[in-house]
Amino acid sequence: MMYPHPIIAKEGWPYLALIGIVTLPVHYIGGIAWSWPLWIIFIFVLQFFRDPQRIPAMGRDLVLSPADGRIVVVEKTNDPYADREALKISVFMNVFNVHSNRSAVNGLVKEIQYFPGKFVNADLDKASTENERNAVVIDANGHIVTLVQVAGLIARRILCYIHVGDRLKAGERYGFIRFGSRVDVYLPLTAEPLVSVGDKVFATNTALARLPGLD
């Protein structure tokens, strides 16, 4: 189940191969004068699909960020996927962020719920309930943690590689959202948020909250 953490995400390999197939002959025939726009596109795609290895934040009972991005929501609300009141923390991913999604906790995958939907701006609150999304409900040492991949205005492809019954490790790569979007995290009300709206976070490196009894 563990992903080998390549420098370039596997989701980007087909794009790089296609651009390379076009760029190399153009460069060979016309030189850099003709091929430089294609090389710029190649470099942009290379940067876009980067997938660096991450070292988990140190400490006990930590809920790690599942994505790179910016905190847009920290609030108590209803978790519609686990039917409970919960602490919700949302990470907005723009097109320049790393797009891999990683587990926030160690735990057992109890449910995976997919919902087709719209593609409104993922920075808006209504994106959580109206957009295409994929919810993963995890039992983390008796605590329910819900991770929701949400598609956005540009991101229209949610990828999830895990199944019900899989065991995840905190920081383990479990999905990908092409071209950025949003990940909502729902935690028990006993969780203490460690981030605020506007904070910049990094998947696995940043702790979103502390949940007593998690470890």
Curated annotation (Swiss-Prot):
Which keywords accompany this UniProt record? Answer: Cell membrane, Decarboxylase, Lipid biosynthesis, Lipid metabolism, Lyase, Membrane, Phospholipid biosynthesis, Phospholipid metabolism, Pyruvate, Zymogen
InterPro entries given in the database record: PS_Dcarbxylase, PSD-A
Highest taxon of source: Bacteria
Task: State one Pfam family annotation.
Answer: PS_Dcarbxylase
Positions of the site: Cleavage (non-hydrolytic)? Answer: 180-181
Regarding how it is modified after translation, the entry says: Is synthesized initially as an inactive proenzyme. Formation of the active enzyme involves a self-maturation process in which the active site pyruvoyl group is generated from an internal serine residue via an autocatalytic post-translational modification. Two non-identical subunits are generated from the proenzyme in this reaction, and the pyruvate is formed at the N-terminus of the alpha chain, which is derived from the carboxyl end of the proenzyme.
Residues that the record marks as modified (Pyruvic acid (Ser)) are 181
The annotated subunit structure for this chain is:
Heterodimer of a large membrane-associated beta subunit and a small pyruvoyl-containing alpha subunit.
Q: What is this protein called?
A: Phosphatidylserine decarboxylase proenzyme
Q: Source taxonomy lineage? A: Bacteria, Pseudomonadati, Pseudomonadota, Betaproteobacteria, Burkholderiales
* Gene from which this protein is expressed: psd
